[in-house]
Amino acid sequence: MASSKELCSIREWAPLTEVIERIPARLQRGFFPANLNLTCVDATEEFLAMGSDAGIVFWYNRHTGEMQKLKAEVATRITCVRVVNSVEYMVAAGCANGQVSIFQIQKELPRDLDLVAPCTKSRPIERYTIRDLHKCVVSCCEWSKNGMKLYSGDRQGVVVLTELDYQAHLSKSVEILSEAYEIVQLSVRQSYLLVATLYRCIVCQMDAQTSQWNITQVGKKDRKQLIDCGAIFLKKQEANKPQLVCGRPGLRFWVADAAGNVSKTVIFRDAVLRSPTWEIPILNPKQRSEPSGTHHTSASTSSTRHSGLADGDVGYVASSNFRQLYLYDGHDSLLVTHDDATLYVLNLDRLKVEAVARGLRKILDFCVCGKEIFVLEGNRTLLRLAPLPEPPNKTAKVIFNPLMPPPVPVLGSHLSQLESPIELQAEPVLQNAEECFELSPVEQLNLNVPIEIAVESPLTQQNRRLEIFRRIGEMDFEQSIVHTTRKTSVGKPPEASGVGIVEIGHETHELRLPLTNAATLMEASYCQMENNGLASPLDMKAAFLQHLPDALSPTTLQKTVAEKAKTLAAELDLPEVHLAPLSQEELHAVQAQTPQISDPLIRCYPTHLEEASIQTSSRENATNPADDYHVGEPVDGIRSFGVSKRKMAPLKFVLSQPKPTLKLEENRDDEEYTSFLPDFRRAGDPLAIHKETPATSDSNTSSEWEFLDN
């Protein structure tokens, strides 16, 4: 049996954040995302199984920190989950639609069989689905010890037995019991099945000869009210029949045998009102509403509340009945049960509450694995209560609460040490010498102080610390300390604060430009790495301007262009180019070598936008109705148009074979430049009288004509 010292060391050592963080907070259901909530929990020494309202069982490995998803056939709420450690891990999950999904998970080979591991073939997870037997929500399920049989019960009182054949991969299900009320809890011991309903508790045994189930009611008195009390088999036996304990109204228990004979009645009404042996500390307890002017310690609080209770009231009990029952560490005398928001560890032999956890907000489900108690407090809150902290795995970090007092050491327990003690070896003495040390000052002890005041109990110390945190939580702080809002100017850079506050997750030496938006930010420069190899964010303007010279300095610009010219000449094997301003003599020499163009030729080119434009329609104010040959008409084959009726000019064609030389007639008064291009002199004054353009060719074949590419 577990000693009282071991029970007094039960506490919540660290939050299970590593487990909860691996479960997604939201899940896509149809077109809209929804929150993912946990509904039930079960545990073994190596794994945790957590059901959810999305039809997924989360299978968490406590040694490696890995998380797997076991999906049911239908994505509906999982109401109960049970795990058995047999040849393989068997996980049963009851759903709200009446289906039961069974998952068969292969075990890993032990370390001494690592040589055989490459020869074996890992099998995938297999799923069996039980349909059409449960018509409503499955309330509970229970495995046999070898994992070959599964018993499941629903809210209509139907109990179904499922037998599994792992070799043939078959399952056979049959209905064995139909009660009138909801099944609360199931317990299996050898060939006996203990069924606890809202109305009564019965024992079922299968006859090997007739294959019929014999039903026996526990006790002769029926319940006067419908309560959801559980029942469980004990390990001890009398006359080759297992013993059982079942709950009764009014915080009572019946201890009976498999034949239904009640041996004794255990009442815990007075024991619950008394102060428990140990109050389990919780990291984030719920603040209890207390009477005004009451400052409590562990002893004064219990005595005050016990004396102030009226007749028929129960102290901390939210309801006057216990719920499901489990054995603590396999001991028959220690029961773990709960009500709405309080967890109890009861001692049946001493009629005493060994430990109690009162700081829970709500208990959705709980399970017991040896000396560990896992409590599902909320939709995403899982607590672990144990005398020792969780052993570290490959990914999780062990977080101890420094505010909690150290637990009482359990002497003689094999779990009292997480690691083997370090063996100290004597070091060889290099040289004998005398060590000098300073004596501490001698302090006088006051022997008149009583022992009760000098030694503070762990429970009193814990309550005192909880009172300090409660007072801190009730203090009224300014909201601006927690939530600050400030507006930064767009035109001015942010001023550096001298207070020394560093924002978590940001670098303090990062350069921020005020006129840079998010679209122009770059992750890092391709040519520059800062912060010891880490890329610092730069904006595009700063990334390019840091390599450019000052545009306002002519000297710097001239040097930069000269270097560029030398580099280009070296790459292209060109003679070296010297960039320098031209002198007046060189400028006059260049102007002297440039041929002078006559003034009439210069006037041929248009100098204004109106002169260079092409006219495509008739002009109403035209004074000279002479033909215009440069407004889109072909050079050859010109037709004369009347003054009164003017049409649009057809497409313009030009001879593709121009004369080989260009001639400039100098003897004529009106100098004319002949070329294959249009006469730009006519563009200067379209209303002037021009001579008839001579024909350029006698042939009008299509091979000599092409479109003019303007």
Curated annotation (Swiss-Prot):
State where composition is biased (Low complexity).
292-307
Locate the compositionally biased regions of type Polar residues. Answer: 613-624, 694-704
Statement: the UniProt record of this protein carries the keyword Zinc-finger: no
- What is the source species? Drosophila melanogaster (Fruit fly)
Q: Which Gene3D superfamilies match?
A: YVTN repeat-like/Quinoprotein amine dehydrogenase
GO cellular component terms given for this protein: cytoplasm
* UniProt KW keywords: Phosphoprotein, Repeat, WD repeat
Q: Name one Pfam family in it.
A: Beta-prop_HPS5
Where, in residue numbers, are the WD repeats? 31-70, 133-172
State the name under which the record lists this protein. Answer: WD repeat-containing protein CG11141
- Positions carrying Phosphothreonine are 488
Note down the stretches annotated as region Disordered. 283-307, 612-635, 685-710
Superkingdom, taxonomy of origin: Eukaryota
Q: Which GO terms describe its biological process?
A: protein exit from endoplasmic reticulum
Of which family is this protein a member?
Answer: Belongs to the WD repeat KIAA0329 family.
List every position bearing Phosphoserine. Answer: 553
